[in-house]
């Protein structure tokens, strides 16, 4: 996928409107920022179990794809729990979205990372979903990203 945008600062009334926006401006797709909010805001969201096939048709008809689900809070945040990360993996898997993007804003111990994402990594491996660490801020240092990838030793972990 070449050109995509994040829905973080894009406000559209429906999932279809977001698809039309992407198509009209020549994007090849978009990443969904804050999947929980997306699912509750858009009645026609690809993240709603009973709307997946309809939403996929909206994407397919415009030659678009959802490239990733992006978590709004960093992993070290109190708002990000192990259950939430696993929920993102489940939503991505059921919706046919290949990637989840997470971030770390400051140094955190591997114990905290294990607590927050080890269950999600196992689920992601089984569902062939990639958990990608955003390489900016604290993780702009390539060695730090490689350290995380090596720590988990999983094909489900990568960098964005």
Residue spans of the language-model regions?
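N-terminal pre-domain/capping segments
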Residues: 1-98, 154
């Amino acid at each position: 996928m070449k050109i995509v945008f994040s829905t973080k600062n894009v406000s559209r009334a429906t999932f279809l409107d977001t698809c039309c926006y992407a198509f009209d401006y020549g994007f090849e797709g978009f990443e969904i920022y804050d999947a929980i909010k997306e699912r509750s805001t858009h009645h026609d969201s690809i993240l709603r179990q009973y709307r997946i096939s309809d939403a996929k048709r909206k994407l397919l008809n415009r030659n678009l794809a959802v490239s990733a689900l992006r978590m709004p809070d960093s992993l070290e945040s109190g708002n990000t729990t192990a259950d939430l990360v696993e929920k993102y993996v489940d939503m991505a898997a059921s919706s046919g979205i290949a990637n989840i993007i997470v971030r770390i804003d400051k140094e955190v111990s591997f114990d905290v990372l294990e607590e927050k994402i080890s269950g999600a990594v196992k689920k992601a491996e089984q569902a062939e979903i990639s958990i990608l660490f955003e390489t900016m801020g604290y993780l702009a240092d390539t060695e730090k990203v490689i350290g995380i990838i090596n720590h988990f030793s999983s094909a489900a972990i990568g960098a964005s």
